[in-house]
């Protein structure tokens, strides 16, 4: 079984779902055996949809907490499209399930199937899930053993379909398309000063001249050093002012993060060359050195990113085409009974078992797509 499948199984089995003290106070009774999505070959139950929704709920609330955000009332908050966050999340779950159904439906076109070994792993995972969760949790989720087995089967097809669906994607990327240059630069900011009351005040001309003089001092020291191509620019910057520093970065033709004037200056240089004047950018003065016109490591990484982007676009295009032709009905009446609220909260408990380092790492990484 590959790493992705292990992660999916870890999420559903090793991560035991538990109810909070308030669970059950805010949801209508749902019948998990009712059909939620009915397609050409498969029917996904409300219980399965509810399980996927709770997995998403746990992940989102955990992420919000990790980022220091509050979760109280988050599901009732409005999004840009006018729906609540809860409604948007439910819509997303439906799209996830529809996609998995279609991937399974088209699996034979790519000679993809679930092996006996994978079926055995799924059966074992389902058994562990049912044993690990309390009767109260299972009833609240309104899932049956067959629901979890179907979900893990759909996950398996989803995982196995990506490679054959993207096999014909052009993986050739020329250096000219992916080229990344490596530079080192010192930035002396001329942005407005922030006052104690939170307001801002622009720098005076004299203050800006002082900033430019600092940048000039850094440049002069760098050019006067024994080997400007290899000199530590950060050390020189701090010799001028302890608050100054230098940064190493890479950029490509499509870069929009770095200052335009800084990039223009860097592009005129060869390996190891220092731009011989202070660059006046937007709200800053810069000293810049081009370390490598073509950073091989960064360029190869960019090539990989471009190929992955091509594959993802091809994969999504196929899925979208299938969705347009698909006849999948949604049981809106029953799905409406499934809600997200502060009064219906789930937790994800990690198993109290010893694991190998690789397995332990995967348990913490497992995420629901």
Feature names for model-found ranges:
Residues 1-2, 15-18, 43-57, 121-122, ...:
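Solvent-exposed loop/turn and edge beta-strand elements of beta-rich ligand-binding domains
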Residues 28-143:
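N-terminal targeting/tethering segments
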Residues 34-39, 79-94, 103-113, 143-148, ...:
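Second-shell loop/turn segments in exported
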Residues 217-262:
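Peptidyl-prolyl cis-trans isomerase
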Residues 27-32, 39, 136-213, 257-369:
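PPIase-associated folding chaperone regions across multiple families
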Residues 20-24:
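C-terminal motif of bacterial Sec signal peptides marking the signal peptidase cleavage site
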Residues 114-120, 228, 238, 301, ...:
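Extended intrinsically disordered, low-complexity coil regions enriched in Ser, Thr, Gly, Ala
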Residues 2-12:
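Bacterial N-terminal signal peptides that target proteins for export
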């Amino acid at each position: 079984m590959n790493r992705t499948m292990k992660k999916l199984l870890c999420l559903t089995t090793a991560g035991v779902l538990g109810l909070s003290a308030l669970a059950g106070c805010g949801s209508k009774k749902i019948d998990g055996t009712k059909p939620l999505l009915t397609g050409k070959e498969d029917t996904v139950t409300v219980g399965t949809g509810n399980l996927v929704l709770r997995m998403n709920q746990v992940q989102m609330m955990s992420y919000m907490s990790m980022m220091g955000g509050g979760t109280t009332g988050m599901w009732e908050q409005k999004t840009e499209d006018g729906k609540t966050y809860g409604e948007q999340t439910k819509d997303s779950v439906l799209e996830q399930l529809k996609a998995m159904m279609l991937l399974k439906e088209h699996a034979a076109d790519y000679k993809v199937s679930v092996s006996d070994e994978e079926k055995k792993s799924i059966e074992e995972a389902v058994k562990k899930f049912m044993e690990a969760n309390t009767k109260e949790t299972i009833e609240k989720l309104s899932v049956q053993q067959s629901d979890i087995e179907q979900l893990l089967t759909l996950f398996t097809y989803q995982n196995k379909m990506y490679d054959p669906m993207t096999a014909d994607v052009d993986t050739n990327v020329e250096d000219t398309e992916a080229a990344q240059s490596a530079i080192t630069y010192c930035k002396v900011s001329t942005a407005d000063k922030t006052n104690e009351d939170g307001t801002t005040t622009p720098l005076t001309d004299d203050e800006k001249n002082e900033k430019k003089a600092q940048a000039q001092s850094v440049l002069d020291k760098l050019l006067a050093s024994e080997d400007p191509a290899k000199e530590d620019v950060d050390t020189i910057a701090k010799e001028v002012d302890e608050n100054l520093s230098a940064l190493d970065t890479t950029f490509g033709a499509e870069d929009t993060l770095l200052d335009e004037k800084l990039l223009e200056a860097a592009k005129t240089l060869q390996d190891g060359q220092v731009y011989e004047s202070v660059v006046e950018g937007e709200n800053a003065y810069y000293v810049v050195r081009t370390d490598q016109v073509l950073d091989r490591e960064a360029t190869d990484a960019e090539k990989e990113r471009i190929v992955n982007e091509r594959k993802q676009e091809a994969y999504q295009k196929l899925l979208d085409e299938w969705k347009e032709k698909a006849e999948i009905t949604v049981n809106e009446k029953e799905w409406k009974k499934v809600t997200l609220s502060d009064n219906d909260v789930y937790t994800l408990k990690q198993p109290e078992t010893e694991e190998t380092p690789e397995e332990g790492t995967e348990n913490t990484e497992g995420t629901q797509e």
